[in-house]
Amino acid sequence: MTENNFDWHDIVNNVDPVLGKNFLELSEHIIEQESEIPKKYKELILMACLATSCNNKGTRHRGYEAMHQGATDKEILEALALASLAAGFSTLSESIGSLSDQFTIEPSPST
């Protein structure tokens, strides 16, 4: 898996601040507006899309936002599992790893 070492938002804002501002306003509008898709599901969809592109930072951020909007561990896992059907099963392990400290599960007892 390849993780980019740069923040593309910073590059866009540096090269074309107007484009950066417009993109930020558009993305905030799409995510924040009240619509037929509740915010929790928007965040789950975005998280799954980011997982398919191996964007661990984005997957973690959107997963955290989905949890903040009420998504359960099971909903997070199901969305990531669906993403792995499109992108391969390594997507599932990578994306779970990026969110591992956010899950509320208890560790298995040692036998």
Feature map (PLM): residue ranges:
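Residues at alpha-helix boundaries and short interhelical turns
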Residues: S35, T52-N56, G70, A87-S90
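Amphipathic, charged-and-aliphatic alpha-helical interface segments
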Residues: K42-N56
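C-terminal structural segments of small proteins and small subunits
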Residues: L77-Q102
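Mid-chain, well-packed structural core segment of small domains
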Residues: S53-A81
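Residue-level signature of transmembrane alpha-helical entry/exit and packing/kink sites
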Residues: K40-E43, E78
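Alpha-helix C-capping/helix-to-loop hinge sites
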Residues: H29-Q33, A48-T52, A83-A86
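Acidic, glycine/proline-rich low-complexity segments that act as flexible tails and inter-domain linkers
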Residues: M1-Y41, E94-T111
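Short alpha-helical linear motifs
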Residues: Y64-A71, A87, S98-P107
